[in-house]
Structure formats: C-alpha cells, structure tokens
C-alpha cells in the first residue's frame, strides 16, 4: 500500500507545477478575491454563515460532475476530485488573503488604535475572553493603553469616552442594535429586535406589563418568595450560607411566579432547577464565543453542540404551553400581557410563535440573573467593605410609618447603596453592542464610520475618573450628600436610555429593595467564618450576565423596631 501511495504523490507534484494547474489555481484565487470584494464585503453574513459551506459544497458537486461527465477525454474520479480540490483551495486562499489584507491595510477603521490582531478577526477578542474570565478588566487595560477609542475587531470599536453613553444609547441616538442580537435567529425576543419600528410595536404589551399598577400586582409573588427565603435563613441562623446560591434560587423562583404563575420551589426544597445549571454553563460559553456571531450559527446547526441551546428553548416552550393551559382567577402575570397581545394580533404565524417563546426565554433567564447579581452585590458591599451602612439603613427604616414599595423607594441610604452597587457590580460588565447609522456618528469630535459595531464597556466607563471621583471606592454618599463625587451624571445609566431602556426597572428595584430590607431589618449580617471576600471579587466572570463566586454570610436574629 505504501509504494502505491508514494506513487500518487509523485504524480501530483508535476501536476501542480504545470502551467494548466497554475492557471487554474490563479483563476480560483482571483475569483476568491472577487467574491470578497463583490459579495462578502456587502451586508451581514453572520446568521447565514452556516449556509456558506453548504453553498460551497453544491458548487464543488457541480464542478465534480462537470469534470467527470463533460464530453471529451475520460476523467477519473481521482483526477476530478483533484481538480475540484485545486479550485476550492485557490478560491478559499484568495478570499482569505483579500479579507485579511483589506482588514489590515484598507479598512475604514484603520485610523483607530488597538492590537493589530484585532484588525484581522474577532478571534482575537474571543481569545482574550477565553483566557481571562474577568475580561472586563482586560478591556479596561486596553483603554488604558490605547485611549478612549479602541479597535477590538475588524468592524468593532470599544468606546470609553464620557460622551459616548448619550451618543450611542440615548433617545436621540440613531444607532441600532448590532449583529450580536441576531445570534439566536429565528427566535427573536423583544431584546433581540433590531428594527426600531418593530421594536416599538412589540414593546407595547411589555409596557403594560411593567406599568406601576401592574408591578404592584406582582407584589404577592415577591412577598411569598421572600418569606420562603427568610424561612431558610431562620433555619440556618449562625451558620454559613452561600448567598450567591440562595439569591439565585430566590430570583429564579420569583421569575416563575411573576412571569408565568409557575411554582419552581427551588428555595423551598433547597435545590437548583436543572435548567439553572444549563443556563450557567451557557452564560459562560456565550461570554466567550458570542463575539464571533457566525460561530453561533454553526453551533445552532450542529447536533450535540446545540444541546444547551435546545434545552433552554425547550424549557421556554414548556413554560409557554403550561401557562396557556392555566386558568387564573384575575391574577395577572407578565405572560398574560404578552399572550393577550399575541391573540389580539390575529395573525398566528410560525414566526410569531417563535417570538413568543423567545420573549418567554428573555423573562426567565435575563430577568432573574440581573436582579440576583444586584442583590448579591449589595450584600457583598454591606458585609465586606462597608458594614456601617447596615446601621444607617436600619436607622432610616425605623423612621418609616410602614414598609411598602413606595416608602422603600424613599429610603436614602438603601437606594444609594443600590446605585453604588450597580456602578461597581454591574450585571452586564462589557456593555451592549450597537451599530452606527449608515451616515456615521460623531463622539467627542471623532467621526465613526457608518455600520460600525460599537460597545461601551460599562465597567470601564463607571471606573473612569472623568465620570466619578475616587471611582474604585464604594461611596454611596456620592448619590446623596456628596454629589460632587459624580462628575458626569450622564455617564451613569444602569437601566440604559432611550427606546431600548429596561422596561423592568421598577420591578427589579422593588425586588432588590424588598429582599434586602427584610434581611437587614431582621438579622445581623456578617461574613461567615472563613469567608474570603477578596476571592469573591477576584473570581467575577464576564458573560451575558456576570458570573459570581460563593458569598458566604452568617445571619443572627436582631430585634425589629415597630413592624
């Protein structure tokens, strides 16, 4: 067998050297360059990426058939395969060389500084996130090295200028959502809609679901969930409790009740729902690979690799189906508003069903995670760095005639602690992708070309001395009695701005305030023996929502005043 194999190799070498083969390779190489310039440079190819190999295979099959069956001297299967391989190699080489040359030397973003490999491919920033779980610190380092405008990808900029938030995210901005939001296509949630008109239409039932009166209807669910959490704390008084674990159970349970009137009973049974494990692993993977949006297309289409994604979507479908079967006694939940709008549209299509499932997924996984990160962050600061604020909050609570969502919104120190936690412990550290309008965008006098993907790294922005004095210190007074420490109020918008702002803000804040107050007024809260707050801080990870290490606290009962 070996001599026969060597004979084939010896035959191949002169074939490569022949003028005919060189001409064929050159033609394919030039065709690859032309394909990049004429086709692949136009529009977005991210969500269509999985179809490109299919198209290439079809072309290869046509070429193979041509060489095998075209009239003329007979061509062996081996020779036909060799010729098709030559053309394919030349075409791919031409396309690749053209793409890399264009990005490295001729691209419209070449005037922006940044690591040279970032010009060539999003694999560079992907590798940063893969190697550094706290990639938000790495991005901050890039800005310290290169300045306010950093090229982090072939068509992507990271912008940390104080004016950037208003220019990119405000209501007057012409920026739209970028290709990142299409990665779960054809499942399109409200969060993923890139067309502003469609987003405005789909947003209406959400606005009804989160208006003040509707939010108050969710209060019984919040109280029930809080009581279940308090029961678990009561059983473990004086013992170590991992509040990262317990608060995540609490918010997941709460999301089930508020969104679908479903009972997951994670807190009650001290057990994580299986879907939480899948969501956690997906969150970590998403933080790494989502920078290469086209790769998500391949993952979605590949059996085995798409198992987690299918499980998350399947769970969301199950919640929708279960909720549709339920008969509620006038009690509203978030899904009831979405379902009502779905029926009123009167046009049930395959896409509208997918969108409904996507919206369900948005409520379940985005809502519970961000609230949990905020509550846990508050507990971290109140026990690890600034326990004196616990006393201040209790003193302010003691002055209230009653505790309810309205009075808690006025408790100065509590709300200052929440704001400062959102600044230093923001759930979405790396920000949200936007795309500049076709005519481009000016930020601080710097022109950014049209159709450029742009991200504002909130972690870096919130630690910028141009925006906040003593930015790395936890100082809640900057939101109350020392407002001079907030140098640029317009640089702080944790719930975003404009048409894409967070509709669930009032519900999220009600949840955070309620559970914190019930814990603070009932218990003395301290770090558990052996707890390592520095390890907690050091092990934060970047993802769709920030990943957190265990936060071990101990609770001992205290006397409550007046309630």
UniProtKB/Swiss-Prot annotation:
GO terms for cellular component: membrane. Pathway: Alkaloid biosynthesis. It is an enzyme of class 1 (oxidoreductase). It comes from the Eukaryota. Keywords: Glycoprotein, Heme, Iron, Membrane, Metal-binding, Monooxygenase, Oxidoreductase, Transmembrane, Transmembrane helix. Its EC number is 1.-.-.-. Glycans are attached at residues 279, 419. One of its GO terms (molecular function) is monooxygenase activity. It is a multi-pass membrane protein. It is found in: Membrane. Its cofactor is heme. CDD domains: CYP67-like. Heme binds at residue 502. The keyword Iron-sulfur does not apply. GO terms for biological process: mycotoxin biosynthetic process. Its main location: membrane. The chain crosses the membrane at residues 20-40, 52-72, 80-100, 362-382. Belongs to the cytochrome P450 family. Cytochrome P450 monooxygenase; part of the gene cluster that mediates the biosynthesis of paraherquamide, a fungal indole alkaloid that belongs to a family of natural products containing a characteristic bicyclo[2.2.2]diazaoctane core. The first steps in the biosynthesis of paraherquamide is the production of the beta-methyl-proline precursor from L-isoleucine. They require oxidation of a terminally hydroxylated L-isoleucine to the corresponding aldehyde by enzymes which have still to be identified. This is Cytochrome P450 monooxygenase phqL. It comes from Penicillium fellutanum.
């Amino acid at each position: 067998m070996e001599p026969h194999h060597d004979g084939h190799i010896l035959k191949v070498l002169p074939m490569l050297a022949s003028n005919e083969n060189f001409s064929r390779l050159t033609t394919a190489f030039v065709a690859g360059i032309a394909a990049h310039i004429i086709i692949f440079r136009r529009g977005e190819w991210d969500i269509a990426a999985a179809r490109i190999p299919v198209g290439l295979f079809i072309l290869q099959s046509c070429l193979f058939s041509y060489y095998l069956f075209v009239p003329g001297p007979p061509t062996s299967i081996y020779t036909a395969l060799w010729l098709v391989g030559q053309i394919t190699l030349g075409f791919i080489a031409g396309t690749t060389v053209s793409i890399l040359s264009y990005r490295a030397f001729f691209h419209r973003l070449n005037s922006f500084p940044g690591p040279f490999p970032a010009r060539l491919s999003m694999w560079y920033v992907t590798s940063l996130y893969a190697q550094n779980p706290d990639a938000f610190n790495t991005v901050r380092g890039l800005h310290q090295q290169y300045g306010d405008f950093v090229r982090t990808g072939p068509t992507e900029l990271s912008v940390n200028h104080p004016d950037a938030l208003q220019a990119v995210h405000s209501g007057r901005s012409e920026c739209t959502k970028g290709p990142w939001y299409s990665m779960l296509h054809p499942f399109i949630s409200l969060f993923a809609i890139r067309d502003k008109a469609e987003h405005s239409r789909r947003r209406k039932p959400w606005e009804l679901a989160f208006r003040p009166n509707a939010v108050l209807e969710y209060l019984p669910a919040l109280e029930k969930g809080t009581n279940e959490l308090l029961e678990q704390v009561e059983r473990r008084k004086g013992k170590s409790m991992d509040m990262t674990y317990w608060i995540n159970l609490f918010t997941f349970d709460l999301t089930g009740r508020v969104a679908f009137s479903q009972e997951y009973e994670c807190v009650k049974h001290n057990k994580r729902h299986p879907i939480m494990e899948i969501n956690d692993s997906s969150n970590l993977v998403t933080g790494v690979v989502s920078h290469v949006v086209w790769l998500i297309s391949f993952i979605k289409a590949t059996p085995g690799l798409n198992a987690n994604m299918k499980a998350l979507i399947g769970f969301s479908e199950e919640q929708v189906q279960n909720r549709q079967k339920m008969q509620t006694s006038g009690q509203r939940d978030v899904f009831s508003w979405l379902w009502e709008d779905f029926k009123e549209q009167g046009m049930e299509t395959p896409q509208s069903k997918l969108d409904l499932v996507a919206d369900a997924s948005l409520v379940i996984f985005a809502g519970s995670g961000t609230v949990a990160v905020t509550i846990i962050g508050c507990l971290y600061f109140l026990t690890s760095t600034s326990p004196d604020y616990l006393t201040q909050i209790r003193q302010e609570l003691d002055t209230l005639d009653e505790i309810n969502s309205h009075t808690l919104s006025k408790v100065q120190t509590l709300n200052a602690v929440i704001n400062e936690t959102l600044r230093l412990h923001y759930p979405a550290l790396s920000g949200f992708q936007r795309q500049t309008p076709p005519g481009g965008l000016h930020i601080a006098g710097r022109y950014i070309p049209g159709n450029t993907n742009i991200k504002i790294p909130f972690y870096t922005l919130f630690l910028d001395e141009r925006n906040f004095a003593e930015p790395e210190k936890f100082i809640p007074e900057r939101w109350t009695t020392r407002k001079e420490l907030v140098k640029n109020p317009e640089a702080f918008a944790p719930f975003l701005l404009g048409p894409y702002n967070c509709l669930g803000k009032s519900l999220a804040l009600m949840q955070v305030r309620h559970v914190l107050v019930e814990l603070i007024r009932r218990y003395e809260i301290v770090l558990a023996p052996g707890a390592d707050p520095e390890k907690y801080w050091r092990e934060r990870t970047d993802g769709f929502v920030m990943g957190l290490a265990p936060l071990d606290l101990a609770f001992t009962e205290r006397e409550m005043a007046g309630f």
